[in-house]
Amino acid sequence: LAANQIGIEAEKAALDRGVGSQYPAAAGVPELKKEASRFVKAFLNLDISPRACVPTTGSVAGSFGSFIACTQRIPGKDKVLFIDPGFPIQKSQLRIIGVQWEEFDIYAYRGAALHDKLESMLSTGEIAAIVYSNPNNPAWICLEEEELQIIGELATQYDVIVMEDLAYFCMDFRRDMGHPFEPPYPPTVARYTDNYILMLSSSKIFSYAGQRMALACISDKLFDRQFPALAERYKDAGVFGPTLIASILYMITSGCTASTQYAYAEMLRLSTEGKINFVEDTREYARRAERMKKIFTDNGFHIVYDYDATQVVGDGFFFTIGYGNM
C-alpha cells in the first residue's frame, strides 16, 4: 500500500524547518515520545510514560538492541525463547551477538496447554526473554487473552522479559478495534506483567516501511530497574532504559532519522485524535488474503495454521499454505 501521505508531508515540513542539520537526541525527539505515550493509551489502554517510549530505526533495530540488554542484565540468564512460527531475522540477530536460543511451535500448545510447556522451558532459569509477534508473522494466528495471561504471569515468576512484536497492530480484522480510547483493545501481555517491551512499527499500519521507524515501548518499572551486571559492563548506572538507549541502541544506529520521527509523531497524533483510521487503511490486506486463500484452497492447497485457540484464523497480511504433505 502507498505510504501515508500525512507522514510524507510532516517529514517534508520537518526537513524544511532545518532538522536535517542537527543530530537527533538518542532518546528520541520529545514530540514523538509524547505522541507514542498517547497512542498507547488510546489504542491499548496502557499507561507508559513518554520517556519509556523509545524510537528505533525499525523494529529490527529495536529487537537487536533489546536482545542485547535482555541477555546481559543477569549473569547466567542469557538465552532467548521464541514462540514460533516467527521472524527468522531475529534469530540471525542472535547469531551476530553469540546468543543461544530455544524455540517451540505454538500450534500444539494453544490455550491452557501453553502453561506447562512454557513453564518447563522457563524453569531452567536460563531464559532471559520471550519473543513472539501478535498477530503472528507468518501464520497470522493471534494469541488470546488466556495465553497472554499465562505468558505474562510466568514471565513475572521467572523474571523474563517479554518482547511483544506488534508490527501488525490492530490488524486482527475479525474484531472491531482501532477506535481511540474505546474498547475493544487489542490483547497484550502488558496487562499481565511489568516485564515487557512492546515493539510498534510504522511499516505496516502507516505503510511507512521505507523510512525505517518504530518504537520500543517499555514498561516504566522495567525502564527504571537497575541491574548490577549492566552497570559493570557499560560503566553506567545500569538502569535498563537509559542503558538500552545510550549504551546499546545509540551504538547501533546513533539515533533515528529526525525528520522521520516527526512524521511518525504526526501520524500517531492524528490517529489518537481519530483523524487517521489506520485499521481501515490496512483492511485491504484482509480482502486480498481472503481472495488469495480461496484461489489456493480451490486448487488443492490447504491452510496450515488454520485455527486460533477458539476460532478460525483471520485474514490479514500473511497466511500459510500446504499441498499434500508439503
Model-derived features with residue positions:
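Conserved core of the PLP fold type I
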Residues: 16-158, 163, 169-192, 197
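N-terminal "arm"/small-domain region of PLP-dependent enzymes with the aminotransferase-like
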Residues: 1-24, 42, 160, 250-251, ...
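Conserved core segment of the aminotransferase class I/II
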Residues: 9-12, 191-283, 296
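Short beta-strand segments
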Residues: 82, 131-133, 163-166, 200, ...
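Short, intrinsically disordered, charge-balanced linker/junction segments flanking boundaries
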Residues: 1-2, 122-125, 232-237, 319-326
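Conserved PLP-binding catalytic core of the aspartate aminotransferase-like
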Residues: 282-326
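Short, solvent-exposed loop/turn segments at secondary-structure junctions
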Residues: 1, 60, 87-88, 108, ...
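Alpha-helical packing segments of well-folded alpha/beta enzyme cores
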Residues: 14, 32-36, 62, 151, ...
